[in-house]
Amino acid sequence: MYSTVRTAVLDGISAIPVQVEVDISTGMPVFDMVGNLTSEVREAKERVKTALHSVGIILPAKRITVNLSPANIKKTGTGFDLPIAVAILTAMGVIDADSIKDCTLAGELNLNGEILPVSGILPIVFDEYNKGIGKFIIPKQNENEGRLVCGAKIFGISHLNDVIAQFDETAFTCQKTGMAHELQMDEKYADFCDVNGQKFIKRACEVAAGGMHNILLVGPPGAGKTMIAERMPSILPPLSENERLELSKIYSICGLLDNDSSLRDSRPFRNPHYSVTQAALIGGGTRINPGEISLAHNGVLFLDELAEFKGGLLDLLRAPLEEHCIRLSRAGRNVTYPANFLLFGAMNPCSCGYYPDMQRCRCSEPTLRRYFDKVSQPIIDRIDICVEASPLSFEDINSTTSNESSADIRKRVMHCHELQKERFKGESFSYNSKISTDKLEKYCFLGSREKSYMENMFDKLGLTARTYHKILKVARTIADLDGCENIKTKHLNEAICYRSINEKFWGGAVS
């Protein structure tokens, strides 16, 4: 007696088809499972046997062999419980094989036969549907998540008896839920109109959002660094449908997708504490789950108290900041997760927080140097905009002048993004911050006057090639925000202002 059932295993945010084969033959009574399995998958044998017994199914006293194919792919997770149980029931003749034909199953089994939810249902249903599979049997608690895929026929079950009961095509829920709908900005984001003063910082944030430039704020406690960072997502454009789907897949894998029959509409804002572990920040663990940098995909990763992060942890961001993804390896498995985020860093200017106010700062010169050395130069080199947040004055705190709202700023940022979208058609990048070095001259062209200005500033400030390129990219964004086709001297001058802090706090050139 032989049967096969289709399921899938996650590989990053994609799903790879897996065939669960069951053979029941004469021989010594034994239950074997093969197919490159992790311990949690091998444990399915006991869960399946007990669950079947709890619903009155007695396994035959024969040799039962379960194979999860292909064998070259590591099988991990608890979503194989249900497919294995159904494959056994089909081989025993309890379930009609035709009823699960062209169907993908996933779900974890309780010992009493209850079907428990599993993570990653959205990428499984999406990828399997695109491979031509139209029907899906998944846990009831994952039903809304499965219905996010337009056209997929989802059957949510809560108990093994639901599968054993005979059903046909009409038993499937055929509701087609389109993913596209009018997006609304998430009201949970605070508004920039609440921020008094700090006009220079707010302008820097607008430029950062306009070109998706990484930004660092350095300033004393109470300068409003965290308050400003929390408002950064409110000036970013809404997610595109592809961005929403990709982000929702990541949250589905982590079990964080809201069970409300909708994809994630808002850009994420992740704010991990500086005590975060390596696995929590970049991803990893036994199942190689996504980390904070992937949960911040297409959104903002806010790292407060940047200098307090554990030694070497920040340097792990160097590759993701360049490649916009993270490659993780563990126990023979290699997984890649998206990690295209806007890095927003914030830190005090010294250990006590009051440098360069020498009347209040208690730090010695060696202490200052050790403090800034906690943030390596390679990380600073990957941050386009570094600005100083000055303490708020009494007038700023008590100002009754109305401030510009996030909605007004977002309009300019969205127009800036539209210009870049049109400009970079056919390119591998979409934003000014991502312009490759070989395309800088094409997209950041300087006239003779502007080139002469930058030549003078290059020698005067001792710029490096890397810094020069960053200034050009930021200047391109400033020009876009101002509605200028070409980069002007004023745009270059403003871009240089967003790098001058490096000389003050890291010593040396504006690099």
At which residue positions do the language-model features occur?
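Residues immediately C-terminal
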Residues: 111, 301-302, 308-309
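Peripheral, non-AAA+ core regions of ATP-driven protein-machinery
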Residues: 1-216, 220-226, 329, 467-468, ...
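Walker A/P-loop
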Residues: 217-258, 323
